[in-house]
Amino acid sequence: MARSTGKVRAARLTDLAALGELSRLAQGEADATRSLGLPVSGPPIGVFSLFRLPLGAFQPHDALYVFERDGHIAGLLRVERDSGRDEWTVVELDAVGGLDAGDVRFRLVQHLLRDGAKRGATRFHVACADADDNVELFMQAGFVRFGDERILFRRPGDMPAPWSDAETRDAGIRPTSPLDAVALSRLYAAVTPQPVQRLECVRIADWERQGRDWRVPRSSLVPILRFADVYTYVLESRGGGRDGTQLDGFLQVGVAKEDQPHYLKVMARPEADVAPFLRFALGVIVERADKSTLGREGVIAPVRTYESPLDRRLEDGGFEDIATVTLLMKETLVRVAEPRLVPAGVR
């Protein structure tokens, strides 16, 4: 790997034109130019999506870092910050062309980790294809590989009709509410392996967040797809379980208003019949999507490998496997085996 000459710094408004061109090149149609190897790229970089009004009380939604060399932008790294959980997610990492592109990307990641730790970030997330040394780059920077996620896609075409209120009620499907937080936490614990639960550290309070702020359960595509509308539903268990609140499934639907696929994330118990739940989800998209674009956009659904047989139920519903991505994470906190008093520090 060639050693690059240059420096990493925070992006400035005057970098916008160069950033837009670099992002466009890295997210072209050729697979080799996708910086992280994800099958869906984000919307083009624009001044309104990346830079907010310079008010001291507000932080920009995204943080950008660039690699500058000889007055030119040779690389960029963009992260989405979840202020509620102090988690940062890498959504773009570009360095197009040149023999030292790998070193440029590594230096951007190292700068991100240093700057994020100073700003109180507790976890860094990234999802990438296991190609072009993506996984090796992040593991060299201290990230831990904890799972894989299959990306399934349903091509535009015939979609189920929206359900009536009576059909929805009879199937035990209803919109979520903050009161479902405990039941959703139990559902997540029932379908997620213990090691992944410890790494993701999803709290009951995270399940209370609604709408666009909902970031659980995590997937590789949530930070990249910028939804106009997000809808969430639960599938109630027949009989309600021991305490009457048990849930068999959770559904998150993102209806895209841009030139991107609609989004579907399902979490369900292995023994639950989710086929009606999936048909309901597709009906929600038909009902909520812009009718002029419904026939052009497909539906994309991420499924983690340990969530089987959910992937087979999606394939039965017309979805096909288009990619597999690797999930990695780095923690800045130190885990302890036993609680104890430690010296306090000031950030």
Predicted regions and their residues:
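Conserved acetyl-CoA-binding loop-helix of GNAT-fold acetyltransferases
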Residues: 100-116, 140, 273-288
